[in-house]
Regions:
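Generic, well-ordered alpha-helical scaffold segments in large soluble proteins
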Residues: 47, 51, 68-75, 98, ...
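Charged, flexible cofactor/metal-binding loops and thiol motifs
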Residues: 124-129, 136, 151, 158-319, ...
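Helix N-cap/coil-helix junction residues
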Residues: 56-57, 225, 386, 407
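Glycine-rich cofactor/substrate-binding loops
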Residues: 2-43, 105-106, 272, 287-470
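Short, well-ordered beta-strand elements within core beta-sheets of diverse protein domains
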Residues: 49-57, 127, 174, 243-251, ...
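Short runs of predominantly hydrophobic/aromatic residues within well-ordered alpha helices
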Residues: 44, 92, 96, 242-245, ...
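A helix-coil-helix interface module used to build multimeric assemblies
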Residues: 2-209, 214-221, 282-283, 294, ...
Length: 470
């Protein structure tokens, strides 16, 4: 049998001429959808059993087909050259051709009642469900690294910023757990996308449904789905679950990029808050002193590629009429690439963070900046009945005067402060300490040591719940 005949096997009888060789290479998807071979074999086995139950195959024929599929799957795992040399149009064509070569006419019966349209919609959903589980496992490892660093640095202070300007003091553990909260939401978002994928389109045919007596619910159960699709036309063209998974990956990548940005800044000499591990850093071919945060920079850079995958599929989908269109073939490479990149980014982030050494001396020294307790000065006035807006204005004037006099607010004498408000007294000094500023933020979610300790325990409890769900 010629290559061209093989290429046309699933649909070629209506045509007089073979496909142009350049067009065939352009349109064939085997080179990337071969990744769906495990899902293809699982679907084919379930379909063979379903049509045997429906009387389309005898029990013996169904068993023969399942046995042949098992043998082909075993070969596919042990013979990569077989896969690499294939000229199949797609993953469905590859398996059907091999099955017919093995079983003859019996192998040709397997496609009864189904279409590549409902097959690929089903297999892609199966893939997304497993991919989501893989990403959530990786996120759990990143959350572990965050929890361990937070425990190790539980009471280490640091300057908190807004607009990249010193704002109020924080605990380093509070900063770490802030990132942890974002990643935990990512795990939930990925799970929600997988939930949307947990609907079985198989039995929808090309667009109008299946004409043979099959139990779709039993088929869905065999393939690990929780329900069946409600409308065959929608089922073969729906890629919402793909977009949702790509959106979840894009949001995850955005959170990774923000974590990376913090680390790049904190590792710079101007900050010096963290020593990056040698094994996740690189040097310069010219400047021997350099230790570059390439792990974090690459995480930041790869985020754009994941955004691109999401936008590419949005643009592909926006102009499609109802039902399946060949444009939908473009969904898979976008998702495969985004999944692979996101998975690698999470693994590298977890490993780099776990091996990083935070410099308590630099963090503590930076947290002593008197400007960080300016809010404490206003709060102090409020405790004596001064309205906050008035207190804010008083402290603003104090800060302006201190700057003009070349002093910090801690260096301003009580007598000088009383010129701005008679409320100031000698108990003020204790209110302006770093320890006091941290301790006063004791409500749940705050940066006081006790609040952060409680938050860490709750974070670990939710992490355990995530892991038990995998």
């Amino acid at each position: 049998m010629s290559d061209a005949a093989s290429q046309r096997k699933m649909w070629g009888a209506r045509f007089d001429r073979d496909p142009d060789a350049s067009f065939y290479e352009f349109e064939r998807s085997w080179k990337f959808d071969c990744r769906l071979l495990p899902q293809e074999f699982a679907l084919d086995r379930a379909w063979a059993q379903a049509i045997a139950r429906g009387g389309i195959l005898t029990k013996e024929e169904g068993e023969q087909i399942v046995g042949a599929l098992d043998a082909l799957e075993t070969r596919s795992k042990s013979d990569p050259a077989w896969l690499d040399s294939s000229k199949a149009e797609d993953v469905h064509h590859f398996v059907e051709t091999a099955l017919i070569e093995k079983l003859g006419a019996l192998g040709a019966k397997l496609h009864t009642g189904r279409s590549r349209n409902d097959m690929i919609a089903t297999e892609f959903r199966m893939y997304v469900k497993e991919a989501a589980r893989e990403i959530r496992r990786a996120i759990a490892s990143l959350e572990h690294a965050i929890a361990e660093q937070a425990e190790r640095n539980l009471k280490v202070p640091m300057p908190g910023t807004t607009h990249m300007q010193h704002a109020q003091p924080l605990l380093l553990s509070h900063w770490l757990l802030a990132h942890g909260e974002a990643f935990h939401r990512d795990a939930e978002r990925v799970a929600a996308a997988a939930l949307r994928a947990n609907v079985c389109p198989l039995g929808s045919g090309a667009l109008s449904g299946c004409a043979f007596p099959l139990d779709r619910k039993a088929l869905a159960n065999d393939l690990g789905f929780s329900s069946i699709s409600a409308n065959s036309l929608d089922a073969v063209s729906d890629r919402d679950f793909t977009l949702e998974y790509l959106f979840a990956l894009s949001t995850l990548a955005m959170h990774l990029s923000r974590l990376a940005e913090d680390f790049v800044l904190f590792a710079s000499p101007e900050f010096g808050f963290v020593e990056l591990p040698d094994e996740f850093s690189t040097g310069s071919s010219l400047m021997p002193q350099k230790k570059n945060p390439d792990a974090w920079e690459l995480i930041r850079g790869k985020t754009g590629r994941i955004y691109g995958s999401l936008m590419a599929l949005f643009v592909t989908m926006k102009g499609l009429p109802s039902s399946y269109q060949r444009d939908l073939q473009e969904d898979k490479e976008n998702l495969f690439q985004a999944h692979d990149q996101a998975l690698a980014m999470v693994h590298i982030a977890a490993a780099t963070l776990a091996a990083s050494q935070f410099r308590e001396d630099r963090l503590r020294a930076a947290a002593q900046d008197p400007a960080l307790v300016a809010t404490e000065l206003a709060d102090y006035l409020v405790t004596f009945g001064v309205p906050f807006r008035e207190a804010h204005e008083i402290v603003g004037k104090v800060l302006r005067a201190a700057g003009q006099e070349g002093k910090s607010i801690r260096e301003m004498s009580i007598e000088r402060l009383k010129e701005f408000s008679p409320v100031f007294d000698r108990n003020l000094a204790t209110a302006l300490t770093l320890e006091s500023a941290l301790a006063r933020r004791s409500l749940p979610g705050g940066t006081a040591p006790g609040a952060v300790q409680s938050a860490l325990q709750e974070f670990k409890r939710r992490l355990a719940g995530l892991e038990s769900d995998l």
